Amino acid sequence: MTATRFLARMSLDTDVGTALSDTRIRLLEAIEREGSINRAAKVVPLSYKAAWDAIDTMNNLAPEPLVVRVAGGRQGGGTQLTDYGRRIVAMYRALEIEYQSALDRLSERLNEVTGGDIQAFQRLMHSMSMKTSARNQFAGIVTGLRVGGVDYEVRIRLDAENEIAAVITKASAENLELAIGKEVFALVKSSSVMLTTEPSLKLTARNQLWGEVIDIHEGPVNNEVTLALPSGRSVTCVVTADSCKALGLAPGVAACAFFKSSSVILAVYG
């Protein structure tokens, strides 16, 4: 039987999905070279929307933005890596070299033990992977815990300018071992997020994130709208095409994404 060799295609995962992968790193490298998300997406290759989705996810999960938009807009090459983004790319490539070396040693050992039959090991690795369908994924720090009759209200600071609240059961809070200062991930489905462009509108929803429309992906009935938040993060929601038109949504328009605290799902490491 032919000996099996693992090839490094490294991905760095969080409990809510992949944060960094070979494809995403190649996208970042292409942005650095091309200075344009459109041209970078073609180099990888990725669709224009998939490239922006990847960037939004990375920026939302990282403590600092990896990519920023600069004067010129989404259509004119106004995209560049931050210094933090460049450091992440360099770190990833250095880890990849070490990762390949470790895989070579592992492959040699497994071939000695199993004669190259490692399908069971590969199936185990596959079964342990996890992804989430929630479009909005935010990394944050617990800043407040308030006990209610049957639930907990959890305050999460996303960054210096944005904070959200989640309401979960006492059992869930105990299972997650929540405490002030603990890092958590907040997941919010795009279908749970609503939009308004009226600053004076009084809302009952606890979570209100003001930003600027940067992308509208149009569908036959619903549109997917993405707002850029001041911190470099983003939030995506699904609204009907009619509502999108009535609100006058277009790139550059200021809008507020709001959602109930009960719509927020929390996850933690380990």
UniProtKB/Swiss-Prot annotation:
<protein>
    <recommendedName>
        <fullName>Molybdenum transport protein ModE</fullName>
    </recommendedName>
</protein>
<feature type="domain" description="Mop 2">
    <location>
        <begin position="202"/>
        <end position="268"/>
    </location>
</feature>
<comment type="similarity">
    <text>Belongs to the ModE family.</text>
</comment>
<keyword id="KW-0500">Molybdenum</keyword>
<dbReference type="GO" id="GO:0003700">
    <property type="term" value="F:DNA-binding transcription factor activity"/>
</dbReference>
<keyword id="KW-0677">Repeat</keyword>
<dbReference type="InterPro" id="IPR000847">
    <property type="entry name" value="Tscrpt_reg_HTH_LysR"/>
</dbReference>
<dbReference type="InterPro" id="IPR005116">
    <property type="entry name" value="Transp-assoc_OB_typ1"/>
</dbReference>
<dbReference type="InterPro" id="IPR004606">
    <property type="entry name" value="Mop_domain"/>
</dbReference>
<dbReference type="GO" id="GO:0015689">
    <property type="term" value="P:molybdate ion transport"/>
</dbReference>
<comment type="function">
    <text>Involved in the transport of molybdenum into the cell. May have a role in the early intracellular capture or metabolism of molybdenum.</text>
</comment>
<dbReference type="InterPro" id="IPR036390">
    <property type="entry name" value="WH_DNA-bd_sf"/>
</dbReference>
<dbReference type="InterPro" id="IPR051815">
    <property type="entry name" value="Molybdate_resp_trans_reg"/>
</dbReference>
<feature type="domain" description="Mop 1">
    <location>
        <begin position="131"/>
        <end position="197"/>
    </location>
</feature>
<dbReference type="InterPro" id="IPR008995">
    <property type="entry name" value="Mo/tungstate-bd_C_term_dom"/>
</dbReference>
<dbReference type="InterPro" id="IPR003725">
    <property type="entry name" value="ModE-bd_N"/>
</dbReference>
<dbReference type="GO" id="GO:0030151">
    <property type="term" value="F:molybdenum ion binding"/>
</dbReference>
<keyword id="KW-0813">Transport</keyword>
<dbReference type="Pfam" id="PF03459">
    <property type="entry name" value="TOBE"/>
</dbReference>
<dbReference type="InterPro" id="IPR016462">
    <property type="entry name" value="ModE"/>
</dbReference>
<dbReference type="InterPro" id="IPR036388">
    <property type="entry name" value="WH-like_DNA-bd_sf"/>
</dbReference>
<dbReference type="Pfam" id="PF00126">
    <property type="entry name" value="HTH_1"/>
</dbReference>
